[in-house]
Structure formats: C-alpha cells, structure tokens
Amino acid sequence: MKITKIEKKKRLYLIELDNDESLYVTEDTIVRFMLSKDKVLDNDQLEDMKHFAQLSYGKNLALYFLSFQQRSNKQVADYLRKHEIEEHIIPDIITQLQEEQWIDDTKLADTYIRQNQLNGDKGPQVLKQKLLQKGIASHDIDPILSQTDFSQLAQKVSQKLFDKYQEKLPPKALKDKITQALLTKGFSYDLAKHSLNHLNFDQGNQEIENLLDKELDKQYRKLSRKYDGYTLKQKLYQALYRKGYNSDDINCKLRNYL
C-alpha cells in the first residue's frame, strides 16, 4: 500500500492510502516510521504504524487529562475509553505513564489525604470511600490512613461546629449534633467522642433558659395551628425533649406558658 497524501490537521496528521483507507496519526508516528508521500507499506508495517499511532495519540490525550490534576489509573483508563482509544491499547498506555511516573495511585492517595489534613474536614471512612470511587485499591489506601493521625482534625471540625451551634442548642443536643456530624464526615465514634472533651459545654442556666424560650415560641407557632389543649402540650413537650432540653425544665416552662 502506498501513501498518497499526508496533511496536517491541528494536532494530528491525515494519511490517505491508495486502497482508499485513511487514518489520523500523531507527529511522533510520522517521525518514528519516516512516513512521507509515496512511501510503500506492507501489511505488517501498516499494522505496526496503526498500533503506535493509537498508543501515541492515547498517551497525548492522557497527558492532557493529567495536566489539570493528579488522576488514578482508573480515571485515566476511563478517559481514554471515552475518547475511543482501543481497549487493547489502554494497558500499554497506562504502563508507560506509570513507568514515567505520570500516574501513581499510592502517591495520589497520599496527596489526597494530606490535603484533607491541611484544609479538609473528612474522616478516614469518607476519605477511603472517595478514593475507592477514583478506582484506587484498598491496599494503596489503608496503610496511609493507618499512619495518619486524625485527632487534631476531628478537634478542629468539632470546634467549628461548636462555634456555629452553641447559641442555638442546649448542651445535650449540641453534643449530639457535633457527634453525628463527625460520624457523617467519616470519623470514628471514639474519635468523635474524644473531640468533645476539648469543648466547654457549661452553658449558664440563663443561657439555656433563653434558648428554651426561643424554641418554645418557635414550636408553639408551628404546632398551635394543628393542635390545642392537652394534645398541644404533649406535642410541645415531645418537640422540646427531642431538641435536648431537660424534662423538668420543659414541664416548668409549659406550666407557665399554657
């Protein structure tokens, strides 16, 4: 087969053959196979050229994808599939990128976890889930997590939550709120509980009473539209108790309120 035309098309070259076949190749392919107009290729040479062209093009795509941020092996492979790189070529591209240290799942996991320690708020369980979603294997994640101390981060997150809610919730509800938030963020129950030891939940009686008054007014406005009498009183009690207020304090307020 003879090359009848070579034309540059942006980042690729269009090659046309005398059997009416055409294909796009990279500049690396042109150089490697010394392609030029009127050059004759046998079947083996043509197949080698096609394979290298896919490999070269796929690698260039991957490097473009990696230029924005670190990616996992799986993320790069998925990106190549999306751009219709042949499936049997993808492992070769991934291997080259690994050998040249463009991708490294262990380093990616380490960087992701360290960045979270500096400016994130996620515990180990959530971090592991996010890394697994990127296609990183547990054996690349677990050793790094086990060597990372999350106690200071848990304290920082709990302090932020404490500052946000301390003027809105009584001590018990505030503790429950912080604990649940830390669990949702992926911290262990023990770590969440331990982080509470660094917070001051000793609100004064007047502060708690003021919070109770505000919550009672709020619940009354909502519940009095549907209920009255004894049912309203019971509904108010249940709502306030769920918010973490003391049973005796609630009953005292309700006696004077209704």
From Swiss-Prot:
The lineage of its organism: Bacteria, Bacillati, Bacillota, Bacilli, Lactobacillales. This is Regulatory protein RecX. The keyword Cytoplasm applies. GO terms for biological process: regulation of DNA repair. It comes from Streptococcus pyogenes serotype M18 (strain MGAS8232). Modulates RecA activity. PANTHER family: REGULATORY PROTEIN RECX FAMILY PROTEIN. The keyword Cytoplasm applies. Keywords: Cytoplasm. It is found in: Cytoplasm. Belongs to the RecX family. Its main location: cytoplasm. Pfam families: RecX_HTH1, RecX_HTH2, RecX_HTH3. GO terms for cellular component: cytoplasm.
